Amino acid sequence: MIDNILFDLIEREAKRERENIELIASENFVSSDVRQAVGSVLTNKYAEGYPSKRYYGGCSVVDDIENLAISRAMELFGASYANVQPHSGSQANMAAIMSLIKPGDKILGMELSHGGHLTHGSKVSFSGMFFDAYSYGVSRDSEMIDYDDVRNIAKACRPNLIIAGASSYSREIDFKKFREIANEVSAYLLCDIAHTAGLVATGFHNSPIDVAHLTTSTTHKTLRGPRGGLILAGKEFNTMINYNNKERTLDLAVNSCVFPGTQGGPLMHVIAGKAVAFKEALNKEFKDYISRVIENTKAMAEYFISEGLRIVSGGTDNHLFLVDLSGLGITGADAEKILESVNITLNKNAIPFDSKNPSVASGIRIGAPAITSRGLNRDDSIKVAHFIIRALKTKSTDELRKIKQEVIGFISSFDMP
């Protein structure tokens, strides 16, 4: 690379990733094959439209690539329809929502501070700006979704669309119960599995594909693919809906809402990376990987509990969990900074019914996908949890420096994918 300044920055990031324990639940490490696809000549090709229906010439090869990604996504999730063009999970949600309902309609999604996502109705997101947004949360006692409460809220506000999914909820979601509620109030159901897609694809969590009208996801996180979005449909794919004042099947409405509705040309190099990731996820080794992710996550959560810390909802069913730091007398923001100083990366996170501002927060979110991609096992994960507790409890800067060197020595023994 001729640009030495940029090259040095990339090398610094590579070094940071090698020498850090990565616990951000939404991050992962892609394979070298995915990186090769994303860094390929496909970045040169503009391909507005869809396979065999492009607005540019010279698209025969990228048509085959997109069709390959679509077929692999459908096989992986048991779907009848897939759109692999969304640039992100948020854009996948935007297209899915706008294909099902119109601006001003009512949305019912999970409260952001209880584990939801910005695109599920937050006032700072398009979903809260252009739609009449309502929210459900978790029970104060169990810190889990109370489906009877969701039903009562739905009956009270009569939403046009219910969104099931989360970004910091550690329990498996019952999508069938959400569909029952949606049917009772004549609402569409959108399931967002951005965080748990890998668990759904491998059968560790129940699948919403034939339950929801539409399912959205990211292609990174637990799928270990490139950063991007995905929209899927099962048996509802050919349901007739009113889109833009025209009767259309749901799959065609979604296609129109992705392009030209919310995006221009697709990123063909990223779609190629998605195709690689879908193939990798279809292998038995990937199911074994997800099993280890769940095992490592549970091991860390159980260790924190054994050390007297409180885990939101008392445990985890997936790849992440939230730690309430109130007992240690520090905030999530404090913990994030302390841990970054010892080469452990995670994020501050609000806990349900948090009294602190989200920019400060009472908790931290911990996820195991990235460390599992580096080969850490259950015992290694417990050691990671031990590093965290040592760092958060010490008042000594010398001890923090010592922990940092231990962390670097420990994690550097595990290869990057």
Curated annotation (Swiss-Prot):
Chemical reaction(s) catalysed: (6R)-5,10-methylene-5,6,7,8-tetrahydrofolate + glycine + H2O = (6S)-5,6,7,8-tetrahydrofolate + L-serine
GO terms of molecular function: glycine hydroxymethyltransferase activity; pyridoxal phosphate binding
Stored InterPro entries: PyrdxlP-dep_Trfase, PyrdxlP-dep_Trfase_major, PyrdxlP-dep_Trfase_small, Ser_HO-MeTrfase, Ser_HO-MeTrfase-like, Ser_HO-MeTrfase_PLP_BS, SHMT-like_dom
UniProt KW keywords: Amino-acid biosynthesis, Cytoplasm, One-carbon metabolism, Pyridoxal phosphate, Transferase
A GO cellular-component term linked to this record: cytosol
Subcellular location: Cytoplasm
SUPFAM superfamilies assigned: PLP-dependent transferases
UniProt enzyme class: transferase
Gene3D superfamilies on file: Aspartate Aminotransferase, domain 1, Type I PLP-dependent aspartate aminotransferase-like (Major domain)
Predominant subcellular localization, coarse grouping: cytoplasm
Residues forming coiled coils: none
Site (Plays an important role in substrate specificity) residue list: 220
Residues the entry annotates as binding (6S)-5,6,7,8-tetrahydrofolate: 112, 116-118, 247
Reported cofactor(s): pyridoxal 5'-phosphate
Associated pathway: One-carbon metabolism; tetrahydrofolate interconversion; Amino-acid biosynthesis; glycine biosynthesis; glycine from L-serine: step 1/1
Function summary: Catalyzes the reversible interconversion of serine and glycine with tetrahydrofolate (THF) serving as the one-carbon carrier. This reaction serves as the major source of one-carbon groups required for the biosynthesis of purines, thymidylate, methionine, and other important biomolecules. Also exhibits THF-independent aldolase activity toward beta-hydroxyamino acids, producing glycine and aldehydes, via a retro-aldol mechanism.
Record note on quaternary structure: Homodimer.
Name of this protein: Serine hydroxymethyltransferase
Organism, as annotated: Borrelia recurrentis (strain A1)
Gene: glyA
